[in-house]
Amino acid sequence: MALHEGFDPSGSPSFLGSKGTKEFDDLVATVRRDFPAIAQARLAFVTEEKDLIPEGLAYDTNQNLFYLGSLNRKKIVKIDAEGRVSDFVPANRYDLLPVLGIRLDPADGTVWANTFEDAGRTELVHFDSAGKLLGRFAPKDGAAKHGFNDLVVRKNGEVITTDSLNNKVFRLDPQSGAFLALPVYRTLFYPNGIALADDDRSLYVADAVGIVKVDLADNSSRDVDPGPRNTTAAADGLYWHNGSLIAVQNGMGSPRIAAFKLSRDGNRVTRVTVLENRTQFTTLPTTGAIRGNDFYFIANSQIDNLNGDKIMDVTKLAAVRIAVVRLP
């Protein structure tokens, strides 16, 4: 808050004990004055299966449909252009772990998804366009915990995934099934969102501190300079769009959707556009997907109502809403 970067503590459970005090209320009022609510999104889809607890969303350009992963049901559903929802990978078919990030292979349209449970067991799974399992890959390095979270797929089919529990980024060698750690110049703190630029070389990894850029050609890395009065921290979802990074920031107090325009070399933020802030669509967003110039995102993941494999309060469950906002 002292850095004046837009952090709104009213949405963070860490500050529950301070709510209602004059000092806290004054701080919140200052933040909200300088970083006002922005409402540009609209409702796109609703899924009536209230206990999905969705975390991953991906768009299939060829079939014009979305894939939505479920933490609670441990399955993947698809949503067609008319908003009809059906199972893509039904629960219990392949004994999946809770489903997180989902991305498509740009070459063949197959679907990759990360799965992991809080205890530290994780798998990267691969499906064809009909939902048939093509492969499943788990780390075999003996580490106590792994948690594959989000991922990208390169033009050659290589998969790169964040590991939130091991604080690393891994590349999958599809021939051997081994995961190779990507060298990063600093320690990562709960790496989560990940995006790949159109050059198929510049990789952006979001963690609790900010965004790290990795050059996949020479493995050099550096922090993306957020610029003054801005934070790139805590992006759950991160996506590349026309020289900008689209971020779902849900770990910085009150969540927001933001677009970070980058310099030509991709090393610094030159302009920040807050797309949605403190509205009904930023209750607890997690990830999203880009279709054309529109960004679709999970508006109310309800992830805070899930403890391990259990819904804490079923009376609080609501229909899952997917919102959409126009990109700059």
Describe every region a protein language model picked out.
Residues 71, 116-118, 164-166, 174, ...:
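Short loop/turn segments immediately following the C-termini of beta-strands
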Residues 3-32:
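TPR/TPR-like alpha-solenoid helical repeat scaffolds
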Residues 114-121, 300-319:
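Short, conserved, GDST-rich strand-edge loop motifs in beta-rich repeat architectures
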Residues 40-48, 84-94, 132-141, 178-185, ...:
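A short beta-strand motif characteristic of beta-propeller blades
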Residues 33, 37-43, 120-158, 162, ...:
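Asp-box/WD-like beta-propeller blade repeats and closely related beta-sheet repeat scaffolds
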Residues 48-63, 71, 93-117, 140-159, ...:
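Beta-rich, blade/repeat-based domains predominating
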Residues 79-84, 128-132, 173-177, 215-220, ...:
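Short loop/turn segments that connect beta-strands within beta-propeller blades
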Residues 35-77, 317-321:
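Beta-strand-rich domains and repeat architectures in extracellular enzymes and scaffolds
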